[in-house]
Amino acid sequence: MAFLPKFDAGGLVTCVTTDAATGDVLMVAHMNDEALRRTVATGEAWYFSRSRNALWRKGESSGQTQRVIEMRTDCDQDAVWLRVEQTGAACHTGRRSCFYRRVERTEADGGARLVFVDADRLFDPDAVYRK
Amino acid sequence: MAFLPKFDAGGLVTCVTTDAATGDVLMVAHMNDEALRRTVATGEAWYFSRSRNALWRKGESSGQTQRVIEMRTDCDQDAVWLRVEQTGAACHTGRRSCFYRRVERTEADGGARLVFVDADRLFDPDAVYRK
């Protein structure tokens, strides 16, 4: 069966990347056709940055690369799921996962606040990205 | 800390929903402000369907509801991660997860095919949705 990704108007699919060992969601990002091809071809995660409008190999600045254990696609082929071995931390803030804050209900109507969880920094982003 | 979701031009954030027991990604969908509020308020997953342009309680047609164990948001608050207890199957095709096909490399340049994995149907969609 052919892999026929269904790109959105911007030429992108959504990518969910999880830690192959724990199942934790590390990040949500986007891929264009070239990022998909390079990821499949090399076994390393490549993404497309909407803010920088550029193809991007995960870890090319930070060294925090992702080795792909498995790639899957969903029922309508507009999303992919990468199970990876993450070197260090996935988040640009230095946390293991971008999802380091829990949404907790504060009001019966659905009002909520954020609570930090698993939020230790594994690297110092100022040092790593030399900002 | 306030939860300040960063909605896209269509008023949506991306939602990744995983099985709280296994860590498997069940589905990727979208939420608008009202879907977020109802999910937080009720502890059941609500989404916004772009194709139907409608708010949607997961399982309202199929009975395959999702009880939220935890909700998190990511570093830029444009995505949420739901860990859920899934009743039956998450996918409209009757599979447990929408991600029932693996992307496998067939060519060195990144060409790929799809291989079915974990693709048993837990319900018959024709019967459940009465199409």
UniProtKB/Swiss-Prot annotation, chains A, B:
Zn(2+) binds at C75, C91, C98. Gene3D superfamilies: 4.10.80.70, Phosphoribosyl-AMP cyclohydrolase. Its EC number is 3.5.4.19. The keyword Signal does not apply. Keywords: Amino-acid biosynthesis, Cytoplasm, Histidine biosynthesis, Hydrolase, Magnesium, Metal-binding, Zinc. GO terms for biological process: L-histidine biosynthetic process. One of its GO terms (molecular function) is magnesium ion binding. Its cofactor is Mg(2+); Zn(2+). InterPro entries: PRA-CH, PRib_AMP_CycHydrolase_dom, PRib_AMP_CycHydrolase_sf. Mg(2+) binds at D74, D76, D78. Binds 1 Mg(2+) ion per subunit. This is Phosphoribosyl-AMP cyclohydrolase.
